[in-house]
Amino acid sequence: METATVFSIFISCLLLSLTGYSLYTAFGEPSAELRDPFEEHED
């Protein structure tokens, strides 16, 4: 394969894995530990 093809596949996989990890952090089990600044400062 050409170098550009390997590089583009690597970048695509990297972006896909980062997106999956951020979605897991936002909506998965670790989201219970996230704080909500709007709930901390109710008027």
From Swiss-Prot:
Looking at the UniProt entry, the stretches that span the membrane are 5-27
Any one cellular-component term (Gene Ontology): chloroplast thylakoid membrane
Subcellular locations according to the entry: Plastid, Chloroplast thylakoid membrane
Q: Which GO terms describe its biological process?
A: photosynthesis
How does it sit in the bilayer? Single-pass membrane protein
Keywords noted in UniProt:
Chloroplast, Membrane, Plastid, Thylakoid, Transmembrane, Transmembrane helix
- State whether keyword Thylakoid applies: yes
Record InterPro entries:
PSII_PsbN
What functional role does this protein have?
Answer: May play a role in photosystem I and II biogenesis.
Similarity comment text for this entry: Belongs to the PsbN family.
Supply the name of the protein.
Answer: Protein PsbN
Species? Chlorokybus atmophyticus
Top-down, what is the taxonomic lineage of the species of origin? Answer: Eukaryota, Viridiplantae, Streptophyta, Chlorokybophyceae, Chlorokybales
Which gene name belongs to this protein? psbN
